[in-house]
Amino acid sequence: MERLQKQPLTSPGSVSSSRDSSVPGSPSSIVAKMDNQVLGYKDLAAIPKDKAILDIERPDLMIYEPHFTYSLLEHVELPRSRECSLSPKSTSPPPSPEVWAESRTLGIISQASTPRTTGTPRTSLPHFHHPETTRPDSNIYKKPPIYKQRESVGGSPQSKHLIEDLIIESSKFPAAQPPDPNQPAKIETDYWPCPPSLAVVETEWRKRKASRKGAEEEEEEEDDDSEEEIKAIRERQKEELSKVTSNLGKMILKEEMEKSLPIRRKTRSLPDRTPFHTSLHSGTSKSSSLPSYGRTTLSRLQSTEFSPSGSEAGSPGLQNGEGQRGRMDRGNSLPCVLEQKIYPYEMLVVTNKGRTKLPPGVDRMRLERHLSAEDFSRVFAMSPEEFGKLALWKRNELKKKASLF
């Protein structure tokens, strides 16, 4: 009996919402009418969980159906209660708490007095979505991999070997696609990004040379024919002019004789203009038209520091700057054309006591070049060629010892 009193037995009813104007949709405004009883939001939440939710279309309209049957008297009153719940009065605001408590106790007593007939409980309908599983291959996560599908489809080891052969064949083509048979292969096109082959270049060069040779021979034959015609015409003119004995005729004959001289030379008589011949003959042809000091300057642009033994700087006959005209000083872009004057060693010595006044036109960085051969060998105990072969730091050390740095 206590269990029945704790569990409120309600008849099927409807849930309506009387929304307050101030707070629309608040939980306190949701009420339910069951057997002429008005239940609030908290009592709706206290309904046992074994009640089945049949249809949820709106959050404020829920229909509850109990698991037990009702008596004949309750079935007679059922349409009336539903009419009351669907009437416009059902949307009226909830009554006071006193009226609601009295009506609730009366309903509980009436439900307890009626005999309860137990019925078979019905399973509740699920209120969540189940995906369709009509087709077995609809779930992609349960499918085997593609290569296993092919194995299951083929089944035989021959199909497996065929697939492997296809994979190997497709790997030979770019992007695993065979080339279009209508288009030429990439290697057969004219475009080739790499340097040309020497064999191909040589064959093309021979073809061009043969074609040029044939064209030159044809031109020479035409020139020979035209020259013969011109000679014949001039001979006729000479014969006609030789008949004229006046001075005017002699002058015209002289002019024709001058014109008959070979003016142009054929291409075969010209020198070969290959890079090898040009490099060999260009130096002699250019230097022959220049004066002697110009030839020396242009032909010898290396310094005496890098010159081999036996150069002009070390020979006694080319002293006084004769052999040093063509020397190109380190750091200067132009060769030193002016003569290097020779001074005695005492005039070139630099002392630490005071700044020594050097002679005008002296290279302060290379004072040893203004020494004579005898003074150079006496100061440095070596020839200028040997001094030039030394390292820079070694030369500077020797010049410091000799007070020339």
Curated annotation (Swiss-Prot):
Residues covered by region (Interaction with RASGRF2): 224-308
Gene Ontology biological process terms in this record: actin cytoskeleton organization; actin filament bundle assembly; actin filament capping; cellular response to cAMP; endoplasmic reticulum tubular network organization; erythrocyte development; negative regulation of cell-substrate adhesion; negative regulation of focal adhesion assembly
GO cellular component, one term: actin filament
InterPro entries found in the cross-reference section: AbLIM_anchor, Actin-binding_LIM, Villin_headpiece, Villin_headpiece_dom_sf
Mutant phenotype after disruption: Mice are viable and born at the expected Mendelian ratio. Adult mice show compensated anemia and display mild microcytosis and spherocytosis. The erythrocyte plasma membrane association with the spectrin-actin skeleton is fragile and mechanically unstable.
Pfam families: AbLIM_anchor (PF16182), VHP (PF02209)
Tissues where this protein is expressed: Expressed in platelets. Isoform 1 and isoform 2 are expressed in mature erythrocytes (at protein level).
Subcellular location, record wording: Cytoplasm; Cytoplasm, Cytosol; Cytoplasm, Perinuclear region; Cytoplasm, Cytoskeleton
Disulphide bridges: none
Presence of the UniProt keyword Cytoplasm in the record: yes
Modified residues (Phosphoserine): 16, 18, 26, 92, 96, 110, 113, 156, 226, 269, 279, 289, 303, 315, 333, 372, 383, 403
Modified residues (Phosphothreonine): 114
SMART domains attached to this UniProt entry: VHP
Main localization, broad class: cytoplasm
Region of interest (Disordered), residue spans: 1-29, 81-100, 108-332
GO MF term set: actin binding; signaling receptor binding; spectrin binding
UniProt PTM comment: Phosphorylated. Phosphorylation at Ser-403 by PKA causes the C-terminal headpiece domain to associate with the N-terminal core domain, and leads to the inhibition of its actin bundling activity.
The keyword Cytoplasm is annotated on this UniProt entry: yes
Feature: compositional bias, Low complexity: 11-29, 113-124, 277-292
Compositionally biased tracts (Polar residues): 294-322
Function (record text): Membrane-cytoskeleton-associated protein with F-actin-binding activity that induces F-actin bundles formation and stabilization. Its F-actin-bundling activity is reversibly regulated upon its phosphorylation by the cAMP-dependent protein kinase A (PKA). Binds to the erythrocyte membrane glucose transporter-1 SLC2A1/GLUT1, and hence stabilizes and attaches the spectrin-actin network to the erythrocytic plasma membrane. Plays a role in maintaining the functional integrity of PKA-activated erythrocyte shape and the membrane mechanical properties.
Family listed: Belongs to the villin/gelsolin family.
Subunit note: Monomeric (isoform 2); under reducing conditions. Self-associates. Exists under oxidizing condition as a trimer of two isoforms 2 and isoform 1 linked by disulfide bonds. Found in a complex with DMTN, F-actin and spectrin. Found in a complex with ADD2, DMTN and SLC2A1. Interacts with F-actin, ITPKB and spectrin. Isoform 2 interacts with SLC2A1 (via C-terminus cytoplasmic region). Interacts with RASGRF2.
The record's note on its domains: Both the N-terminal core domain and the C-terminal headpiece domain are sufficient for binding to F-actin and necessary for actin bundling activity.
Protein name: Dematin
Gene name tied to this protein: Dmtn
